[in-house]
Regions:
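Conserved helicase core region in the C-terminal RecA-like lobe
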Residues: 63-101, 125-132, 138-142
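Alpha-helix capping/helix-boundary segments
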Residues: 46-47, 83, 144-145
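Long, contiguous C-terminal modules that act as interaction/assembly or targeting platforms
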Residues: 52, 56-64, 78-79, 83-84, ...
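C-terminal accessory regions
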Residues: 97-164
């Protein structure tokens, strides 16, 4: 894509939740992108149903990528980074890219070698998710951004929700 990805510093988790809903509504209101052309990818599969519920509570229908079979549907597609592999959407939003979750912290009983392997896999899955948009990538965090974002700041246009 020719557009530089957006990194949105929402400052706290509640504002991040609000921004996600506002941004999806604004994207659809532009008339250029429908709900079905938006993917929201999360680090963990266990977070997907909560995100679909949160969007639904605000009138935005979501479809779990585990149930998506490629049939067009006017719903935001929501899934894990891992499930995003091989799919493309006009707009991809990666919320909750926080320290300790992307990648996860090293477990107390986890060897350095095991952690290095887990971290490598997490970085790879994050990279896959970041390469799914055709037109625009939006990455958000509420507080305490992931070290991966800090390492890649130059690749993003960094903004706050109020800038958009």
């Amino acid at each position: 894509t020719g557009v530089k990805p957006l990194l949105v510093d929402c400052r706290d988790d509640e504002r991040e939740n609000e921004f996600l809903v506002e941004r999806i509504r604004a994207i659809v209101a532009s008339g250029e992108v429908g709900l079905g052309d938006i993917g929201v990818f999360l680090p963990f599969a266990r977070s997907v149903s909560g995100m679909i519920k949160r969007l639904g509570d605000h009138g935005i229908p979501g479809l779990n990528l585990e149930k998506y079979e490629g049939v067009p549907a006017d719903k935001v597609k929501v899934g894990s980074y891992k499930r995003a592999k091989g799919l493309e959407f006009k707009v991809v939003i990666l919320p909750r890219v926080k320290a300790g979750s992307v990648p996860k912290k090293q477990g107390k009983n986890q060897s350095d070698e095991e952690y290095a392997e887990q971290r490598g896999l997490a970085v790879n899955e994050f990279y896959v998710a970041m390469t799914r948009p055709r037109d625009q990538l939006i990455v958000t965090f509420g507080s305490d951004p992931s070290e991966l974002l800090l390492e890649a700041m130059d690749a993003f246009d960094t903004v706050t929700p109020e800038d958009l």
